[in-house]
Swiss-Prot record:
Catalysed reactions listed for this entry: (2E)-4-hydroxy-3-methylbut-2-enyl diphosphate + oxidized [flavodoxin] + H2O + 2 H(+) = 2-C-methyl-D-erythritol 2,4-cyclic diphosphate + reduced [flavodoxin]
Protein purpose: Converts 2C-methyl-D-erythritol 2,4-cyclodiphosphate (ME-2,4cPP) into 1-hydroxy-2-methyl-2-(E)-butenyl 4-diphosphate.
Record Gene3D superfamilies: Dihydropteroate synthase-like, Sulfite Reductase Hemoprotein, domain 1
Lineage: Bacteria, Pseudomonadati, Pseudomonadota, Gammaproteobacteria, Alteromonadales
GO biological process: isopentenyl diphosphate biosynthetic process, methylerythritol 4-phosphate pathway; terpenoid biosynthetic process
Entry keyword set: 4Fe-4S, Iron, Iron-sulfur, Isoprene biosynthesis, Metal-binding, Oxidoreductase
Pathway: Isoprenoid biosynthesis; isopentenyl diphosphate biosynthesis via DXP pathway; isopentenyl diphosphate from 1-deoxy-D-xylulose 5-phosphate: step 5/6
Record-linked InterPro entries: Dihydropteroate_synth-like_sf, IspG_bac, IspG_bac-typ, NO2/SO3_Rdtase_4Fe4S_sf
GO molecular function, one term: 4-hydroxy-3-methylbut-2-en-1-yl diphosphate synthase activity (ferredoxin)
UniProt signal peptide: none
Cofactor note: Binds 1 [4Fe-4S] cluster.
Name of protein: 4-hydroxy-3-methylbut-2-en-1-yl diphosphate synthase (flavodoxin)
Length: 371
């Protein structure tokens, strides 16, 4: 596999959300947000655990009321993944969840209130060693900025962010990250580009309110892909009107596509045509479903014929090339004598992939111990 990655990460400072490092070259963290009622403690805990199972590094939880803050206390005690409390309007809620061990506070400059309220949040965060995210959003800019610019613009989002960066600077508080999200790809991208030139703090990327699963994934991949390819971004959240688990999957797929961070299998599969010797589409779909639990990074090529199959297999950890009745099997680019019956491909491939993943995981573990 071609291994060169031309991406040079933007230099930034580092903060920690719980034990997860953000910025200064740390792996780009993948986040999601619960969509349960936070006061439904049982449902919220279940969703957080499900997100952690599919690889979420950090989970954000909306805390809109003091009742939700009390629920957050129980939730925080029941999960392992770091939690960010999403705070709007009432700064006192931030002070309350800080008592309960929150790992990060997200505040929205457009509605959190005056500088004195921000000062109270910052002092509380400092006392409890909690980082802050300044979360600017094109849909909730301050009224004076909307009056000035008439609509959300990159300059408006930047000005909103810098106002609050300046406040934190005056308070000598540097444990924060910043986001300037918008639902329009170009608005978000240009806003982040401007911000990246102004500060050294880590940047949290996202296209807000991106849409449903398909359209939202595409929009997020385009917008975040542009920024990540330029080295901008230290943590990401894919905002989808879908199951939050899908946000984590799409997030890792974007990072995987740019070879920034890999988790699980990278499937290389042909779209299929008249030359296919087996049902490529159903084979890939079934393997993706069965192998979701694997976390070891590996490339698996599944090609329906011999036109591109051998070439892709040469640069894959596991490769399958379609043949009449039986298909060729490659291991680390080497064609094996063993061939797979086309009627039983999924079971055969699953066994080989799991065995390979186990072997590779052991090698990684040994290498880590040696280092």
């Amino acid at each position: 596999m071609y291994s060169e990655t031309p991406i040079k990460r933007r230099p930034s400072s580092r903060i920690y959300v719980g034990k997860v490092p953000i910025g200064d070259g740390a792996p780009i963290a993948v986040q999601s947000m619960t969509n349960t009622k936070t006061t439904d403690v049982e449902a919220t805990i279940a969703q957080i655990r499900a997100l952690e199972k599919v690889g979420a590094d950090i989970v954000r939880v909306s805390v809109p009321t003091m009742d939700a803050a009390e629920a957050f206390k129980i939730i925080k005690q029941s999960v392992n993944v770091p939690l960010v409390a999403d705070i709007h309007f009432d700064y006192r809620i931030a002070l309350k969840v800080a008592e309960y061990g929150v790992d990060c506070l997200r505040i929205n400059p457009g509605n959190i209130g005056n500088e004195q309220r921000i000062r109270s949040v910052v002092e509380c965060a400092r006392d409890n060693n909690i980082p802050i995210r300044i979360g600017v959003n094109g849909g909730s800019l301050e009224k004076d900025l909307m009056d000035k610019y008439r609509e959300p613009t990159p300059q408006a989002l930047l000005e909103s962010a810098m106002r609050h960066v300046d406040i934190l600077d005056r308070l000598n508080f540097d444990q924060f990250k910043v986001s300037v999200k918008a639902s329009d790809v170009f608005l978000a991208v240009e806003s982040y580009r401007l911000l990246a030139k102004q500060i050294r703090q880590p940047l949290h990327l996202g296209i807000t309110e991106a849409g449903g699963l398909r359209a939202g994934s595409v929009k997020s991949a385009v917008g975040l892909g542009m920024l990540l390819a330029e080295g901008i971004g230290d943590t990401i959240r894919i905002s989808l009107a879908a199951d939050p688990i899908e946000e984590i999957k799409v997030g890792f797929d974007i990072l995987k596509s740019l070879r920034i961070r890999s988790r699980g299998i990278n499937f290389i599969a042909c779209p299929s045509c008249s030359r296919q010797e087996f049902d490529v589409i159903n084979t890939v779909n079934e393997l993706e479903r069965r192998l979701e639990d694997l976390v070891t990074p590996m490339d698996v090529s599944i090609i329906g014929c011999v036109v591109n199959g051998p070439g892709e297999a040469l640069v894959s950890h596991i490769g399958l090339t379609g043949g009449a009745n039986k298909s060729g099997y490659y291991d680390d680019g080497v064609r094996q004598k063993e061939r797979f019956d086309n009627l039983n491909l999924v079971d055969s491939l699953e066994a080989k992939i799991r065995a390979k993943a186990s072997l590779m995981a052991n090698r990684i573990a040994i290498s880590d111990k040696t280092d």
